Amino acid sequence: MMRLSSTLRRFRWAVFATWLLLLVPSIYLALNQSSNLTGGGFEVEGSQSLHVQRQLEEHFPDQGASPLALVAAPRADASYEDMNAAVVHLEKLAAEVPSVKIVPNPQQPAPQPDRPYVITLQLDFNNTGAVDVAKQLRQKVGIHGEEPGESQNGKVKFYVIGQGALGAAATQATKHDIAAAEKWNMPIVLIVLLAVFGSLAAAALPLVLGVCTVVVTMGLVYLLSMFTTMSVFVTSTVSMFGIAVAIDYSLFILMRFREELRAGRDQQDAIDAAMATSGLAVALSGLTVIASVTGIYLINTPVLVSMATGAILAVAVAVLTSTTLTPAVLATFGKAAAKRSSYLHWSRRAEAAQSRFWTRWTGAVMRRPWASAIAAAILLLVLAAPAFNMVLGNSMQRQFDPTHEIRGGVNAAADALGPGALGPIRVLVTFPGEGDASSQAATTTIEAVRQQMTKAPSVVSVQPPVVSDDNDSALLSAVLSVDPEDMAAREAIDWMRAELPGVAGQNATIDVGGPTALIKDFDDRVSATQPLVFVFVALIAFVMLLVSIRSVVLAFKGVLMTVLSVAAAYGSLVVVFQWGWLEQLGFPRISSLDSTIPPLVLAMTFGLSMDYEIFLLTRIRERFLQTNSTRDAVAYGVSTSARTITSAALIMIAVFIGFAFAGMPLVAQLGVACAVAIAVDATVVRLVLVPALMAMFDQWNWWLPRWLDKILPEVDFEKPLPKIEVTDLVIIPDNIAALGPSGSDLRTMVRTAARMKTLAPQTISVADPLAFSGCTRPTTRLSTQRAGRPKAHTPGLHPVTMWRGRLSVAVDALQTEADTEQAPVERRGPVETTNVQLPTGDRLQIPTGAETLRLAGYLIMCRNTTKDFEDFARLVDLMDSHTAALVLASMDRYYCGRDPSNRWVATQLVRRLADPQPSDEHDVRMSGPDAAEDWEKVRQRCLSVAVAMLEEAK
C-alpha cells in the first residue's frame, strides 16, 4: 500500500486527469440515467407469475397487461359535454405519442358525468419503454409533481396510471427525495466534518470525494441500465451509500494522515503511513461490504439485484476514490488539509490522540467486563425484541402519499371499473406436447377450470377463455372484488394454485399469474431465501475478519455482535413504522414493512458495520503487535479510534436519516434501519461489547490454529512504518492542547516566526529541553528537571502563548542587532532554533528556550530598557533561577565583546542584572498603583539570576 501511495503521489496530476475524464461524461450520464430505469423489477425467475407474463407477451398479443392507461375523473359539477370533451382530448393526446394505441375495453361504459372514464393503452413494443412513454403522457396531460392535470374549465381531472406511470412517478419522486435529503444532511455532515477537522479545507475533501463517487456511480448505473433491468430505487441507494461510505473512508484516511503529522512525519511520509494503515483498512472494509451485499444476488429478483448492484458500485467507487484520489489530493493540498482554523475553537484537540475520556471509559469497562457485556447484550436484545412482530408485504402504490396523483388515478379507475379490474388474476391452462387447446377434450378441461375459478374467494367474474396464437394454451381472467394489493387477493391466488391443478388433471398444467401473483411470488422468494442470504453474509464477514485480524475468536465475535446490531435495526423498523411511535415526526404508520427491506438491511448493515469492526480491531492488533498486552492494546485502540468511529457514525447517521425523512417509504425504512444499526454498532457494540469481551477472553482473542495461519493470505498490518526522526521536533501533548490558545495567539505566532526567519536566515536546529517549561502539566519526555531541585510552581501557559513570547523577544533582539552599528557585544554563530508542531498542523521554527534567554540578555546589554528587564523576568518566571543561570553562564560561547578576556560578556550581564538601571529611566511614580511592587519583583528576579550565575562561576 505504501508503494501504491508513493506512486500516486508522484503521478498525482495523471490521477487527477484520469478522474476528470471519468467525471465529465459521468455528469451527463447521471443526468439522463433515469430514462432507462423501471418502476417494476419484482419478477421472480422460474415462478408461475413470470411464466404467465411471458406467455401473454409472446402468444396473447391482445391480452397482455396494459402498462399504461389514461383516466378522466369528473368533479361533481361536470356535465356530459365536459366528460365527452375530456375523453376526446385524452384520446387525441394518446394518438400524438409514437408507438401507442388505444385498446377498446368492453367493461368501460360510455362517458358519464358521475363516473370516471378509463382509456386503456397498449405499446407497439415490450413494456421496457413504458416509463418514457408515461413521462410524455404525464407532460401532455399537464401533471405537475403530485398534482393531476385538468381540463380547461377545471371540471375534469386527468391521470396517467399503470406500471409505466408508477415508474415515471417514482423516478420524479426519487429525484425530489434525493435533493431534499441532501439539503437536510449535507449541512449536518459539513458541521460534523468542521468539528472533527477544525478546517474548511479538510472538511471539503471528504465532501468532494463523496460527490465524485455518486456522480461516477450514477454514470455507471446508466450504462448498466442499457443492458439490464435497473429499478428506480437504485438512485436513492447510490446516493445514500455513495455519500456515506465515501465520506467515511476519506475521513479514516485523513484523520490518520493528521495523526502521522502530529507524530512528526513530514507530509509525504504521513501520506504513505496513512495509506499503509487506514488506507489498507478502507480497502478491506470496502471488499467486505461488497462481498456482503452480493448475498442479495441469491434472491435473484431484478429490483433487489439492481439495488444491490448500485450499492456495490457505490462502495467500489468510494474505495477507489479514497485510495487513489486521497493520496493525490493530500500530496497537493496536504498542508491546507492539515491546518486547523484558529476560528474553530471547538475542534482544537488533535484528532488521533488518545482521549482521556475514552481511556477512562475503556478502563472502567474492562474492570467489569461481565457486567458491561451483560448490560450491553440485554439492551440490544430489548431493542431487537419488537422484530418478532414484523409483518412483511409489498406495494408499489404505497410508496406514494395518499394525496399523490398516482393514488388518485388508481382510485378513480377503481371507481370506473371496479377495484379488481385493474389487476385480474390470469390463469394459463397449457396442454403439453402437441396439445390442441381448441379440441373438445381441451375445451371441456378449460370450462371445468373456469367453473372452479368462480368458486374462489373474492372472485366476481371469470371472462371467457382466449386461445393462444400457437393453439397450445388458453387464458382465463378472473376479476376480484378487492384491490390487487389486498391480502384477500393473495388468498385467492393461494386457493387457485391449490385447487385448479386437480381439476385440470394430467392432461394440462395450470399456472396462476397476474399483478397479485407477481408480488406474492416476489415476497415468497424473499422469505424463502433470506436464511440463505444470512448464512452467506455471515460467512463472508467471518472470512474477511479472519483475513484482516487473523483471529478466529475475534472474527466470530465480530459476526455475532453485528447480528445483534442488525436485529436491533429490525426492531426499530417495527417500532417506528408498524407501531407508529414516531408518527408525529412524519413517519407514517403502516400495516406491513416492505419485503425488500430485511435482506437489504441485513446485507448492507452487515457490510457497513464491518467498517468499524475492521478499523477498530486492526488498530488494536497494530498496538498488540507492539506491546503484546491485550488490555493495553484495547485501551489504546478504543481511545485513539473512538473519536474517529463516532464522527464517521454521525456522518452516516446524518445521511441515512436525511433519506429517511425525505424518501419514499421503502427508502425511509432502509434509512431508518441503517441509521439505527450504525448508531448501535458504533456505540454499544464497539465501545462497550468489544472492550468487555476482549478483556474476558484476554490472550484467547489472538488464537489462530497454525494450519489456518499457513493458508490465510497475508494482510501486512505488521509491517513497521518508517521511523520518525523527532530529535528537534516539539509537539503539543494532548493534556496541554485541550487548554487551547486564542486565534490571535496562533496568527501572531505564525507572522512573528516568518519575521524571525527573515531576520535570521542562518539558523541551526537543535533539541529543546525547555520546550514546555512553564506550561501546565509538562510532559516528562520533553521537559527536564535538575536532580535534587524541587519542581518550580509556575503559572500554567499554553505552549503557543509561551512560544509567541519567545518569538517576540527573538525578533526584537535580531531587529536591534540589525539596527545597531556598534553594539557592545556581537553574535558568534547562528541562532539555535527548534521545530514545533502547532494544533493547526503548521510546523514553525522558533528559538529554543536557552536561545531566548540569551537574546533577552543581549537586549539588556545593548538596549537596556524597562521592557527588556520585564521580558527577561517573565522568561525566568517560566523556569527557575538556577536553570536560567546555567544557560546564561555560557554567554561568551555565543557572543563576543569589546574585551576578549574570558567570561567578559557573562560578567557584564551579571552587573546589569544585579542592579537594573534602565536607560529609559523607569519611574514608578509615573506608573499605576502597583508599579512599584511589580518593578521590585522584576529587580528581585534579575538579582536572583545574577546571584545564581556567580554561584555557577565558582
From Swiss-Prot:
<feature type="transmembrane region" description="Helical">
    <location>
        <begin position="235"/>
        <end position="255"/>
    </location>
</feature>
<keyword id="KW-0813">Transport</keyword>
<feature type="transmembrane region" description="Helical">
    <location>
        <begin position="373"/>
        <end position="393"/>
    </location>
</feature>
<keyword id="KW-0445">Lipid transport</keyword>
<dbReference type="GO" id="GO:0071555">
    <property type="term" value="P:cell wall organization"/>
</dbReference>
<keyword id="KW-0997">Cell inner membrane</keyword>
<comment type="function">
    <text>Contributes to cell wall biosynthesis and biofilm formation. Transports the mycolic acid-containing lipids monomeromycolyl diacylglycerol (MMDAG) and mycolate ester wax (WE) to the bacterial surface.</text>
</comment>
<dbReference type="GO" id="GO:0005886">
    <property type="term" value="C:plasma membrane"/>
</dbReference>
<feature type="transmembrane region" description="Helical">
    <location>
        <begin position="312"/>
        <end position="334"/>
    </location>
</feature>
<protein>
    <recommendedName>
        <fullName>Mycolic acid-containing lipids exporter MmpL11</fullName>
    </recommendedName>
</protein>
<dbReference type="InterPro" id="IPR050545">
    <property type="entry name" value="Mycobact_MmpL"/>
</dbReference>
<dbReference type="InterPro" id="IPR000731">
    <property type="entry name" value="SSD"/>
</dbReference>
<dbReference type="Pfam" id="PF03176">
    <property type="entry name" value="MMPL"/>
</dbReference>
<feature type="transmembrane region" description="Helical">
    <location>
        <begin position="11"/>
        <end position="31"/>
    </location>
</feature>
<feature type="transmembrane region" description="Helical">
    <location>
        <begin position="214"/>
        <end position="234"/>
    </location>
</feature>
<feature type="transmembrane region" description="Helical">
    <location>
        <begin position="279"/>
        <end position="299"/>
    </location>
</feature>
<keyword id="KW-0472">Membrane</keyword>
<dbReference type="GO" id="GO:0006869">
    <property type="term" value="P:lipid transport"/>
</dbReference>
<dbReference type="InterPro" id="IPR004869">
    <property type="entry name" value="MMPL_dom"/>
</dbReference>
<keyword id="KW-1003">Cell membrane</keyword>
<feature type="transmembrane region" description="Helical">
    <location>
        <begin position="559"/>
        <end position="579"/>
    </location>
</feature>
<feature type="transmembrane region" description="Helical">
    <location>
        <begin position="670"/>
        <end position="690"/>
    </location>
</feature>
<keyword id="KW-0961">Cell wall biogenesis/degradation</keyword>
<feature type="transmembrane region" description="Helical">
    <location>
        <begin position="597"/>
        <end position="617"/>
    </location>
</feature>
<feature type="transmembrane region" description="Helical">
    <location>
        <begin position="188"/>
        <end position="208"/>
    </location>
</feature>
<feature type="transmembrane region" description="Helical">
    <location>
        <begin position="648"/>
        <end position="668"/>
    </location>
</feature>
<keyword id="KW-0812">Transmembrane</keyword>
<feature type="transmembrane region" description="Helical">
    <location>
        <begin position="529"/>
        <end position="549"/>
    </location>
</feature>
<keyword id="KW-1133">Transmembrane helix</keyword>
